[in-house]
Regions:
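Fungal secretory targeting signals
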Residues: 1-27
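Functionally constrained cores in energy, signaling, and assembly domains
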Residues: 5, 123, 143, 221, ...
Length: 330
């Protein structure tokens, strides 16, 4: 049996995609930081194997699992396809143009969005101690099945309700830089987060993300500790210790299968950027990094859902910050 994956999300950075913006000294420092995190994460490999193995066995045996595991299909497939790779994050961080501060504290972010059900089994491990990190707030945000982000729906051309295309007035590549794009609404679908439990694990319920012009399919992630929940049920994004911002990607074969189904086929976005073409993925998936989730179809039918395992390796001493000025105000 192959070793289990540690998927410590590679971090997105505008600087990382245009090294001309960095001085020689900055490039040298960045390389040293990457190497240090790489070494720290690899030292944690045995702990991560045990961490993921435990989660998979619990999931396999859990009778009240939210998705249908009929026929043993999931268990057999996952054991055959476990990857063997240790990965770490790059030191620079940015959230992209469609992040919104103060999102809802919730595990299920689907709201009324149609699409293939997606369960994210996310584990967070501290690479300074090789131990799971409890009570770490894990936040996700992504486009819906037809490539639209909540909060940025001004240019919606239709679609299946409460959808909007990524605004054309955003500079940059549509998700990899920190360009601040003005919000057009207060919609909140496919955004939110929840803390890890005492074992450093959190389950998030969403739908499989679609694509939009200029980017391959991805989900944004952020992790912070010492976080605060406001009285209105949102996280106070600037109050905690931000340890991580990144993006997770999916295998092209699974993307193709999902995008051939309804409502993904109804998109007006141009599917011209695949994993092999995405510059952000290229940056994140080199030098020993692994930017792909360990994802499996649940049951015999695609609409039964997909489960994806993600292990995020973070440095608990790191301190980053969000750059957007956009806030969600319920």
């Amino acid at each position: 049996m192959k070793l289990l994956t540690i998927f410590a999300l590679a971090i997105t950075s505008a600087l990382a995609h245009d090294t001309r913006a960095l001085s020689a000294e900055q490039l040298k420092r960045r390389k040293l930081e990457v190497e240090a995190r790489n070494l720290a994460a690899r030292k944690c490999a045995p702990a991560v194997r045990a961490f993921e193995n435990q989660r998979r066995h619990i999931r396999r045996d859990l009778k009240h699992f939210s998705l249908d595991l009929r026929g043993g299909h999931f268990g057999a497939q996952q054991e055959k396809e476990i990857k063997n790779k240790t990965c770490v994050m790059t030191p620079e961080v940015t959230e992209g143009p469609y992040f919104v501060k103060n999102e809802l504290v919730r595990q299920n972010v689907r709201e009324n969005q149609r699409g293939v059900p997606l369960t994210l089994d996310i584990g967070v491990i501290d690479i300074t101690s090789c131990k799971p990190l409890p009570n770490a707030f894990v936040e996700i945000w992504h486009a819906n099945a037809t490539g639209f982000y909540s909060g940025f729906t001004a240019e919606s051309t239709g679609g299946s309700g409460n959808t909007g295309a990524p605004p054309s007035n955003s500079t940059g590549s549509g998700g990899g830089n920190s360009t601040n794009t003005a919000m057009s609404d207060e919609l909140s679908f496919l955004r939110g987060g929840w803390p890890t439990n005492k074992n450093g694990v959190v389950e998030m319920s969403t739908v499989y993300p679609g694509f939009y012009t200029g980017r391959t399919t991805h989900i944004h992630t952020a992790v912070q500790t010492n976080w605060t929940k406001a009285a209105n049920g949102t996280i106070e994004s600037t109050e905690g210790n931000l340890l991580h911002i990144g993006q997770v990607f999916f295998d092209e074969s699974l993307n193709d299968k999902v995008f051939a189904s309804i409502p993904y086929v109804n998109t007006t976005q141009s599917h011209t950027t695949y994993n092999a073409d995405d510059s952000i993925l290229a940056e994140e998936n080199t030098g020993g990094y692994n930017a792909f989730a360990d994802a499996y179809q649940v049951g015999k039918n695609l609409q039964d859902g997909v489960i994806a395992y993600i292990t995020i390796g973070v440095d608990s001493t790191a301190r980053y910050s969000f750059s957007t000025t956009n806030y969600w105000t319920p």
